A protein has these predicted regions:
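Active-site proximal beta-strand in glycosyltransferases
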Residues: 101-103, 116-136, 147, 168
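Short N-terminal targeting/anchoring amphipathic segment
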Residues: 90-109, 121-123
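N-terminal strand-loop element at the rim of the active site
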Residues: 5-13, 26, 31-76, 174
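A conserved mid-protein helix/loop that constitutes part of the nucleotide-sugar donor-binding site
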Residues: 17-22
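Helix-loop-beta element that forms the nucleotide-linked donor phosphate-binding surface
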Residues: 116-117, 162-163, 175-177
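Membrane-proximal helix-turn-helix segments that form the acceptor-binding/catalytic region
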Residues: 88-95, 130, 146-167
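Residues at the starts of beta-strands that form the adenosine-phosphate
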Residues: 2, 33-36, 121, 165-166
């Protein structure tokens, strides 16, 4: 079985990075599955936690950080341009690898993941409580127009999650809501 994890970057000393790597290592070393971790913004930084030599790490090299140094209009242009590039690159890798299962940590790819026709089962895996996904709570605090954008993205995220084949959440409260 081929399993692909999708994550932004494995470069922070955080629970999500550690959890993803531990699960991937277990699946590769103990369960003898073919495991790939695809990141979008690793930027040649080494992973903080050790990755099994049986795992293939692919960074598709999109620097989403470069959008943050501009005004809202330019930032929007960068975001959609980078998302288009991300979709093309991720689609290429999923069609090349032909995974049986793709596990998303509900990052940017959630916007289009279920639209990719690669034949895989799509699973969402949340490593933070629902109100804090994609830092939308911070945008909501900034006032108009950020609050409207955050509401739109939250609604879009909830619709996308419903299209996944399965969803693993952090808390019982998230499961109930």
């Amino acid at each position: 079985m081929t399993i692909v994890y999708l994550y932004t970057a494995l470069c922070t000393v955080g629970g999500a990075d550690r959890s993803i790597i531990q699960k991937a290592n277990y699946l590769a070393d103990e369960m003898h599955q073919d495991v790939f971790i695809i990141t979008d913004s690793q930027k040649e930084r080494p992973p903080v936690f050790p990755i099994s030599p049986r795992i293939r790490h692919i960074d598709i090299g999109i620097d989403f950080d470069r959008q943050y140094h501009h005004n809202l209009l330019v930032r929007g242009y960068y975001y959609f341009t980078l998302m288009h590039l991300y979709r093309k690159k991720l689609e290429y890798w999923l069609k090349t690898l032909k995974p049986d299962i793709v596990i998303s940590t509900l990052g940017r790819e959630l916007d289009f993941l279920t639209q990719l026709d690669d034949g895989s089962v799509k699973i969402g895996e949340s490593h933070i409580a629902k109100p804090y996904t994609r830092n939308l709570h911070l945008m909501e605090q900034r006032g108009f127009p950020y609050k409207q954008i955050a509401r739109h993205w939250r609604k879009k995220q909830e619709e996308a999650v419903k299209k996944l084949d399965a969803l693993v959440v952090l808390t019982q409260h998230d499961a109930d809501n």
